[in-house]
């Protein structure tokens, strides 16, 4: 079991590399992965069940202690990312299926790896976990409402169908995970240790399935979609950080806000696009999944160095006094 837990930690720490490698392989050899499309929704449900296994009441203590900070993060997330997505679709005159895909990923809750990036960045982990949990729990209502509001100009959107899908693939597995944790107690500890491995394998399969199903369209429009995805993610980080600065939050909390706003649950975006629209609509989510793990790792390294520099300046100032 220790070896499996160690493997799980290694795979979790190298998540971005696995997603990138298998996305490239799926693009070069789509026939190897084309049959995996039917696994997208069940695998996302498995990831959400794992999230439920790890959720604790303490994760929501930050909501009680600093409700306005959590509310600020949640509002920033559901305003900035959908808004930027809509503006990018207008600016680039994106085709309907791609536009819906970009808006869809923009309307998803915070990403599953944002907490890890916040920890690496020396951000406020409690705030990060609280924002991720609250945005995920609000997703069954807010995500379909925002998609309907922003994407209906391009393609027909059914609020109720999206609502039921998110309820089944996000909220229900999380609730089942929380119940399992309560009933089994310490017996789920070993399962929790291997969750990073299960999550990484699941997301990798989701990304490869989407890339394989849309290989021809990616070859045709991939550079345009990638440019939009990179801009979307970057504006999320930037506007999230400066929202924290505008409200005079400390550096650690500005980092948390940047990462929670900029990183999306792109697995959910891919699942919803595959189930309700077309394989092409899932491509922005798949590319977002690859890119935000790379950019998140780079940004967290930069943020950590900011803190180290701040620590050195504080120490020098104290020594001078």
Where are the regions a protein language model picked out?
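Alpha-helical transmembrane segments of multi-pass small-molecule/ion transporters
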Residues: 1-321
């Amino acid at each position: 079991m220790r070896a499996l837990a160690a493997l799980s930690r290694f795979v979790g720490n190298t998540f971005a590399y696995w997603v990138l490698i298998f996305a490239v392989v799926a693009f070069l050899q789509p026939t190897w992965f084309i049959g995996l499309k039917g696994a997208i929704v069940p695998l996302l449900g498995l990831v959400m069940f794992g999230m439920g296994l790890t959720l604790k009441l303490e994760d929501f203590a930050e909501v009680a202690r600093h409700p306005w900070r959590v509310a600020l993060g949640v509002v920033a997330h559901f305003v900035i990312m959908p808004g930027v997505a809509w503006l990018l679709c207008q600016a680039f005159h994106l085709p309907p299926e791609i536009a819906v895909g970009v808006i869809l990923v923009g309307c998803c809750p915070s990403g599953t790896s944002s907490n890890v990036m916040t920890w690496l960045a020396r951000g406020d982990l409690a705030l990060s976990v609280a924002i991720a949990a609250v945005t995920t729990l609000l997703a069954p209502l807010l995500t379909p409402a925002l998609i309907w509001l922003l994407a209906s100009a391009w393609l027909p959107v059914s609020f109720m169908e999206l609502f039921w899908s998110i309820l089944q693939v996000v909220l229900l597995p999380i609730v089942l995970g929380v119940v399992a944790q309560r009933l089994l107690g310490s017996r789920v500890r070993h399962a929790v240790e291997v969750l990073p491995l299960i999550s990484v394998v699941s997301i990798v399969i989701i990304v490869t399935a989407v890339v394989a199903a849309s290989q021809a369209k990616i070859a045709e429009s991939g550079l345009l979609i990638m440019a939009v995805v990179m801009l979307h993610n970057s504006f999320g980080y930037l506007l999230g950080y400066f929202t924290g600065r505008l409200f005079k939050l400390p550096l650690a909390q500005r980092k948390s806000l940047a990462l929670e706003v900029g990183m999306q649950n792109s697995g959910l975006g891919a699942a919803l696009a595959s189930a309700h629209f077309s394989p092409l609509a899932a491509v922005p989510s798949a590319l977002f999944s690859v890119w935000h793990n790379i950019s998140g790792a780079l940004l967290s390294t930069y943020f950590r160095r900011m803190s180290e520099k701040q620590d050195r300046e504080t120490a020098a100032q104290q020594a001078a006094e």
